[in-house]
């Protein structure tokens, strides 16, 4: 093939847009349940809150599970910090669970997927999705009952108009990557 390009991109380029909402999903390697215990889920949540703040990303919603997590955050002016932020989060949490398990150098995280949310409807639908993910996975009957996500805070503190918009949001045509089955606690 004479016209075949020398470099064929295997993934589309990432959009790094300042002050824009992103949804991120990450999976553990082979969907292993490294974060099954409550103390490990707390560790994951605390690291997520700490690392996103350190990089200037403003969390809007988050949910952590035994083998994956989702979050929505507004990017800072330099949205290209997404990759180093995720690398730091994964490195920090992997070292912590490896230390708890008495192993070193074990790979914990597989990869992550990010989506730039460019419409209000997409944002509301994804907020709904993240907050209700524990219900989707049948870990709780009501999202507010799951302690490792922001749904309880959102229900208690978000403006009522926003809560109603999110509640009414229909699932986006392209659901987030989520074929995980978390371990029951």
Stretches found by the model and what they are:
Residues 1-185:
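Short catalytic/metal-binding and nucleic-acid-binding patches
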